[in-house]
A protein has these predicted regions:
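N-terminal Rossmann/SDR dinucleotide-binding element
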Residues: 1-73
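Ser/Thr-centric signal marking residues that sit
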Residues: 6, 81, 101, 112
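Conserved active-site helix of classical SDR/Rossmann-fold NAD(P)-dependent CH-OH oxidoreductases
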Residues: 18, 101-102
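NAD(P)H-binding glycine-rich loop region in Rossmannoid oxidoreductase-like domains
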Residues: 59-95
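Conserved Rossmann-fold NAD(P)-dependent oxidoreductase catalytic core, especially the SDR/UDP-sugar
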Residues: 76, 102-118
Length: 118
């Protein structure tokens, strides 16, 4: 199974990736993260790197055609999480939390499993 994990370098994503990468049935994990959380240590601590493809990009601008048809399951964790700061940057929050979710939903086909953490 090939996974796409957006926001994979956040707290939940990094823990999840290390658990999933140890499973035999997981062949590849594609991660898209822009390091907005500045959790660089999460990247350094990744295990089973041979299964991981990492894109250090903002999902807003990422061309999902690069990975289309290579994904069996999407775990969508990317979002703007600082509620206090979100009021002063509504357009960015709309892009991150709504438009990116729409992009992810459009990427999947009828057989793609999508897990969305909100």
């Amino acid at each position: 199974m090939n996974l796409l994990i957006t926001g994979g370098m956040g707290h939940i994503g990094s823990k999840l990736i290390n658990k999933l990468s140890s499973l035999d049935k997981i062949k590849k994990i594609i991660i898209i993260d822009n390091f907005s959380s500045e959790r660089y240590i999460s990247f350094i601590n990744l295990k089973n790197r041979k299964k991981i493809i990492f894109f250090d990009e903002d999902l807003v601008h990422f061309n999902l055609n690069k990975i289309k048809n290579k994904i069996d399951c999407i775990i969508h964790l990317a979002s703007t999480t600082n509620a206090e700061k979100s009021f002063s940057n509504k357009e960015r929050v709309l892009d991150n939390n709504v438009e990116c979710t729409n992009k992810i939903l459009a990427l999947g086909n009828k057989n793609t499993k999508i897990i969305f953490a909100s």
